[in-house]
Amino acid sequence: MTTPPITELTTRARDVFRLVVDAYLETGQPVGSRTLSKLATLNLSPASIRNVMQDLEEYGLLASPHTSAGRMPTEQGLRLFVDGMMQVAEPSAEDRAQIEASLSEGGPIESALAQATAALSGLSACAGLVLVPKHERVLKQVAFVPMSERQALVVLVAGDGTVENRIIDVPAGLDPSALVEAGNFISATLSGLTLTEAMARVRREIEAERIAIDRAAQDLVSRGLAIWSSDGADRPVLIVRGQANLLDDSAVGDLDRVRQLLDELETKQDIAQLLDSAREGSATRIFIGSENKLFSLSGSSVIAAPYRGADGRVVGVVGVIGPTRLNYARIVPMVDFTAQSLSRLIR
């Protein structure tokens, strides 16, 4: 049966579903009808509750583990709860103070990012993650210097004053004026742009046939920018803190999942790709279980938010990873506040 939108559930079904999710997120254990019937907020018999829970199971919102008569939310159920029922409040004054204190210790920005990640890990009881900003410098000047009939030296000057020299192959018989034309075009037209922005503008200009240089110079411009983009230093760095939080008492019955998660955190590449995908949004993103396709863990969730530099561009992502039974209502605003605090620090 297709999972219905929250508005199509009856009031009784919504009440039972909310209580099951709340109890599961608190204890990590399946919830039985007798337990729910004892709650003062739910004036239903165990039999009535069982019928409602059966309906919710048929909708794909609840599941019954083989070892228990109780039920727990599925990944689809958690998604429905997070998107349609969760009530998010501001982080507590104590949480805010601890996050801000972690950022006030001074030192290099990487140290502040690591401290904020450790604080977030401690407050959330998850592993804290931060994607350190890519060093995406801006272009200032580019020159193409002939070296031989088949090679040219590309001199790349960045806005921060760093200079890089790269050698590229050129067609035999290339007119030297094409080298001058390509360098002048980049310095005059693309100066002040990041590499990504410069490459995008060149593509647009070529596709629209607005670029005011000949074909040979166009090829040099594209290849000169591509040489710079191949620099491995531009790859983001992932900092992980608090992996031990994933090995608490509640993980004893799920050691295979935890072991696999720790392996993923050790290699970092798939997690970094997942966090990098959160750069595209403007708000906190929640990836529940297997709905993220970048790594294979079905029992883990990631909450991540982008943070920005002085120019307003997204420069990195901060977040947490833990079991799907996270306290989403508390952790989502906590991650969001950390991202905002990092943005203020970097500016």
UniProtKB/Swiss-Prot annotation:
Provide this UniProt record's keywords sorted from A to Z: Repressor, Stress response, Transcription, Transcription regulation
Superkingdom of source: Bacteria
Cross-referenced Pfam families: HrcA (PF01628)
Q: From the record, what ranges are coiled-coil? A: none
GO terms for biological process, alphabetical:
negative regulation of DNA-templated transcription
A molecular function (GO) term: DNA binding
Q: Which Gene3D superfamilies match?
A: 3.30.450.40, Winged helix-like DNA-binding domain superfamily/Winged helix DNA-binding domain (1.10.10.10)
What SUPFAM superfamilies does the record tag this protein with?
A: GAF domain-like, Winged helix' DNA-binding domain
Repressor keyword on record: yes
UniProt similarity note: Belongs to the HrcA family.
The cross-references to HAMAP family, in alphabetical order and at most eight, read: HrcA
What this protein is reported to do is described as: Negative regulator of class I heat shock genes (grpE-dnaK-dnaJ and groELS operons). Prevents heat-shock induction of these operons.
What protein name is recorded for this chain?
Heat-inducible transcription repressor HrcA
User: What species is this protein from?
Assistant: Sphingopyxis alaskensis (strain DSM 13593 / LMG 18877 / RB2256)
